[in-house]
């Protein structure tokens, strides 16, 4: 497994020494200290000195300092659960805090100026009420800052506060190793609304990037989040974490790759019992030797209906998941997928997608024996050369293999297996306890295909082989299955579908199954006995289970 350009997500013990190499950063994840900081905020807010008050930012304030009472009307610094800071037209639109701010609502009135409100290093802004209400008609900017002295700002949404709409958040990266963490955090039941969040990549070797965290029962809602790649060698990209029962809602979350050799890509991580919900999760590749973005599922998290898209060396990694299987809605793109020893179930959102990357064992947590299950009513087309060593299961919809599956066995419990690729492991169609399992090389398309099985093929009772062809006079294009040994158990059937232009020349032979084993085909389809004649589009075909080189299933046109 090539992991040269793949940057793992940082682990989460306390923020102590940050002089490790980028690879060592994977053993650290800075959320514990983040929660400690949030606890301090709540204690501070509980203090009686934080009385509720509301005020309007002046047209001509004396400075851009939030904490200067003279900048407001009435001359009081707004704060508290029911407190509202109102912004309209002003000649000073760069606003920052010199001490901690706890505010219920920041409101931008219709026609208000475009503001930039910055949480300065070592000072936080906490929304403890409604959150942000923007009626101005323009985007309002919020910035989490960091400085060379190690200070880091923070913006926190807690209780049921909302980030609102037409709001742009930028979370800067620490400017040195071992310093405070700039973070945007959502606590209790807050959500991100339809805001935009940009977590900037690391700017110092060994340091992390900006970070947005969702805790408890918070949701990313309809937000757009971008985790940027690192800007220097040895740094880590911006990150988004979902922890406890938080979910990604309907958000679009993009983890970008780094454009610098040895720089880490951005990352999105789900842990505890967090959920991908109905989000779109994107991991883009890096350039110039930079690491790709990453999407990771840890612990007992669940991908739900999330649409996962990976490209370049941008990757999906489930190797740190502790439960089996881990579900996602759909998978597409050409980036690697790391399974470790886990089972990935794809298809819960019923979409039809094409994945042409490499699905493989390994990942940040290592492990072998990874496996794949296709679920849902849509189709998943595998176009790459997959190397995972566990099995492949089709439980619903269609799995179309135009590349390769892993080396394990392939079982179709329900749904359709097809394509023109290659499978290493033994293939079994049906469970023997009911219908609904199909082998169909064309996979419901109008293009005939040859599916190659390097091991044996078994049709159980209730299974169906769907075979299609197009014929004209002496020529034909047809499906074909190549298998190293074939068993057709009692109760399996074949569905024949052909298109022909006029009468087909007698003697034309179609090979339905090419058996590469020295042994004959064991059994016959219930509706196609050996020597039986079937009529398709006015042409008569005779079945032969000893055709071809003596042990293939063929149909020959007869008078």
Where are these regions (language model features)?
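Short structural boundary motif marking the start of a folded domain
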Residues: 52-56, 342, 370
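Fold-core signature of tandem repeat domains
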Residues: 169, 184-186, 197, 212-214, ...
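Short, T/G/N/S-enriched strand-turn elements that build extracellular solenoid repeat scaffolds
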Residues: 70-77, 93-99, 106, 116-117, ...
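Tight coil/turn sites that cap or link beta-strands
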Residues: 111, 137, 147, 166, ...
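Solvent-exposed adhesion/ligand-recognition segments of exported proteins
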Residues: 5, 45-194, 198-209, 213-220, ...
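Sec-dependent, cleavable N-terminal signal peptides
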Residues: 1-53
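Right-handed beta-helix
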Residues: 268, 295, 342-365, 380-382, ...
């Amino acid at each position: 497994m090539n992991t040269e350009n793949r940057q793992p997500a940082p682990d989460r013990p306390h923020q102590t020494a940050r002089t490790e190499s980028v690879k060592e950063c994977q053993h650290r994840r800075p959320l514990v200290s983040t929660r400690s900081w949030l606890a301090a905020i709540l204690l501070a807010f509980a203090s009686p000195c934080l009385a509720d008050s509301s005020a309007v930012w002046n047209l001509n304030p004396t400075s851009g300092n939030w904490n200067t009472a003279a900048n407001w009307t009435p001359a009081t610094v707004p704060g508290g659960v029911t407190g509202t800071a109102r912004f309209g037209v002003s000649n000073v639109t760069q606003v920052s805090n010199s001490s901690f701010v706890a505010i219920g609502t920041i409101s931008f009135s219709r026609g208000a100026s475009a503001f930039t409100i910055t949480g300065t290093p070592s000072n936080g802004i906490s929304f403890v009420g409604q959150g942000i209400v923007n009626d101005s008609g323009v985007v309002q900017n919020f910035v989490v800052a960091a400085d060379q002295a190690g200070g880091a700002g923070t913006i926190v949404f807690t209780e049921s506060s909302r980030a609102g709409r037409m709001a742009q958040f930028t979370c800067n990266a620490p400017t040195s190793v071992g310093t405070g963490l700039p973070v945007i955090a959502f606590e209790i039941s807050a959500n991100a609304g339809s805001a935009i969040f940009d977590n900037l990549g690391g700017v110092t070797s060994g340091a992390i990037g900006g970070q947005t965290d969702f805790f408890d029962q918070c949701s990313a809602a309809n937000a757009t989040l971008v985790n940027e790649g690192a800007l220097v060698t040895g740094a880590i990209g911006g990150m988004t974490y979902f922890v406890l029962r938080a979910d990604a809602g309907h958000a679009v979350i993009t983890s970008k790759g780094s454009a610098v050799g040895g720089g880490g890509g951005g990352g999105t991580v789900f842990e505890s019992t967090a959920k991908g919900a109905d989000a779109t999760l994107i991991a883009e590749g890096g350039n110039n030797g930079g690491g790709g973005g990453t999407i990771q599922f840890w612990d007992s998290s669940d991908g739900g209906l999330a649409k996962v898209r990976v490209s370049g060396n941008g990757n999906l990694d489930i190797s740190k998941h502790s439960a089996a299987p881990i579900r996602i809605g759909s998978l597409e793109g050409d980036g690697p997928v790391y399974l470790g020893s886990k089972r990935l179930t794809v298809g819960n959102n019923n979409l039809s997608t094409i994945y042409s990357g490499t699905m493989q064992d390994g990942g940040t947590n290592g492990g072998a024996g990874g496996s794949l299950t296709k679920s849902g009513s849509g189709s998943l087309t595998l176009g790459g050369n997959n190397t995972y060593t566990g099995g492949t299961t089709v439980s619903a919809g269609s799995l179309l293999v135009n590349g390769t599956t892993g080396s394990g066995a392939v079982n179709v419990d329900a749904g359709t297996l097809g394509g023109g690729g290659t499978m290493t492991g033994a293939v079994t169609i049906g469970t023997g306890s009911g219908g609904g399992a199909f082998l169909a090389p064309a996979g419901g398309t109008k293009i005939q295909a040859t599916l190659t099985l390097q091991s044996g093929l078994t049709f159980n009772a209730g299974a169906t082989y769907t075979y299609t062809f197009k014929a004209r006079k002496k020529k034909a294009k047809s499906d074909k299955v190549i298998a190293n040994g074939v068993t057709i158990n009692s109760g399996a059937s074949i569905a024949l579908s052909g298109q022909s232009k006029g009468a087909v020349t007698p003697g034309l032979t179609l090979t339905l199954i090419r058996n590469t084993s020295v042994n004959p085909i064991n059994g016959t389809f219930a509706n196609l006995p050996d020597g039986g004649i079937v009529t398709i589009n006015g042409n008569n075909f005779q079945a032969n289970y000893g055709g071809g080189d003596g042990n293939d299933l063929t149909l020959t046109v007869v008078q």
